[in-house]
Each structure stands twice: as C-alpha cells, then as structure tokens.
C-alpha cells in the first residue's frame, strides 16, 4: 500500500513502461478501480487510453486473461522505493532554514485510512518538523473508510476528526490526504481563532506564491 505520487516517481526511477494503482482515490469505496499510468509517470492519455480500452473490450470472461510476461519485470512499490522517494522529496524544500525556525509548528495530519500514513508523517519528520500529530482512528488501514462519508480531504466532514484534535491540542495547522495521497486538504485558524478550510485552489496559490517569492529572494 503506497501513495499514487510515489508510484509515478517509481515509473520514472525504474524506467518502467507503465504503472498500475488500485484505488478509489478520494471517492467512496464503491468507486474502487484501476488507475493506469504511462512511462512518463502520468495517467494514460490519448491515444494509449483508447488502445487499452479496445483490448479490454475484447475480453468476454476473466478466464480469458492469461499472463505470459516475465514476472521479474513487475516491480511492487515498497520500502526500497520509499527510501529513494523520501530522499528525493527532501531535496525539493525551498528553504530548509525556514523549517528549522518553524520546527515546533504543531501539525495535525490524517491519511483518512489511506496510503498517506505510509510516508507523509515520515516525510514531515525528515524535513525537520518535530511536532506532528496524527488522528489515531484514521491511521487504521481500511478500504471501507469507516470514519467518513466520503474520503475527500477538501470536504469539511472528512476533516472533522482532525479539526477536533487540532482544537484539543491547540494545533497550528491541519493537513489531510485522500486515500491514495494525491490530493490534499488543509485547515488553519482565521484572525478570530476559528478553524477554516483551505480549498485546493487556495492551497495551490499559496504554494505558488511561496515558491516564486523565495526563488526571487534567492536569485533563482
């Protein structure tokens, strides 16, 4: 069980032709399905998507499917990839000194029962954050996503347990990832001390602003 972005990285790292991920993504369990990725680490696009579906539609029964390839050419993403991926992630920090000054930032994180639990707490600690708290009830692996109606981290309902914990421990920020950890949800306190959600567009703009501002300051 590993995050989708790690699989995308692994495809490029190992020079694979394609990648497969079984996930419901940020949807309820009924949407569990098959994500296919091409050699660039991105989801399959035209014309390859049509070619794949054309072959699928030729299958009349699951018993018709026979694997005749070399099993040694199939790489399961695991601890070996984790180490390489986390080391790569660590290098993309814009300004490590900022993290050192903010190492006590109190972070609440929830993977909503998904793959983020495998790497995100480790990545945060590897970057230098020393005050990371997870939501125990949602650190349990489960494809049923039993504590939420829908595991979309941009929905208030999915972040309710994390925000409750944040209020209890007086955290600075809440972070959540969807079950395959390619979507993030965040919450912070406004100037009245009320917890508010930051949607995906706002999060992206904040990241972009920070990156551009700091690269200019560093003359890059």
Regions found by a protein language model. Give the residues of each.
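Well-ordered alpha-helical segments embedded in enzymatic catalytic cores
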Residues: 6-7, 84-88, 158-161, 203, ...
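N-terminal small/polar loop signature for handling phosphorylated ligands or for N-terminal nucleophile
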Residues: 1-31, 130-186
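Short, glycine-/Ser/Thr-/acidic-enriched flexible segments
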Residues: 2, 25-27, 41-42, 49, ...
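Short Gly/Thr/Asp-enriched flexible loops that form oxyanion-binding sites at enzyme active sites
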Residues: 31-38, 182-200
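Proline/glycine-rich low-complexity loops and linkers
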Residues: 59-81, 190-220
């Amino acid at each position: 069980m590993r995050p989708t972005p790690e699989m995308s990285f692994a495809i490029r790292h190992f020079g694979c032709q394609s990648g497969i991920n079984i996930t419901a993504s940020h949807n309820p369990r009924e949407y569990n399905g098959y994500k296919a990725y091409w050699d660039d680490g991105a989801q399959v696009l035209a014309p390859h998507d049509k070619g794949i579906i054309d072959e699928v539609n030729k299958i009349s029964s699951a018993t018709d499917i026979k694997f005749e390839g070399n099993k040694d050419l199939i790489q399961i993403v695991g601890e070996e990839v984790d180490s390489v991926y986390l080391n790569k992630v660590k290098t993309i920090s814009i300004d490590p000194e900022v993290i050192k000054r903010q190492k006590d930032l109190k972070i609440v994180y929830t993977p909503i029962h998904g793959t983020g639990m495998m790497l995100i707490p480790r990545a945060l600690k590897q970057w230098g954050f020393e005050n990371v708290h997870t939501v125990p009830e949602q650190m349990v692996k489960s494809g049923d996503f039993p504590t939420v109606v829908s595991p979309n981290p941009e929905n208030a309902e999915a972040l309710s347990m994390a925000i409750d914990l944040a209020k209890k421990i007086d955290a600075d920020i809440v972070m959540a990832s969807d079950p395959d950890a390619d979507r993030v949800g965040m919450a912070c306190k406004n100037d009245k001390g009320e917890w508010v959600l930051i949607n995906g567009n706002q999060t992206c703009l904040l990241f972009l602003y920070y990156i551009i501002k700091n690269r200019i300051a560093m003359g890059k």
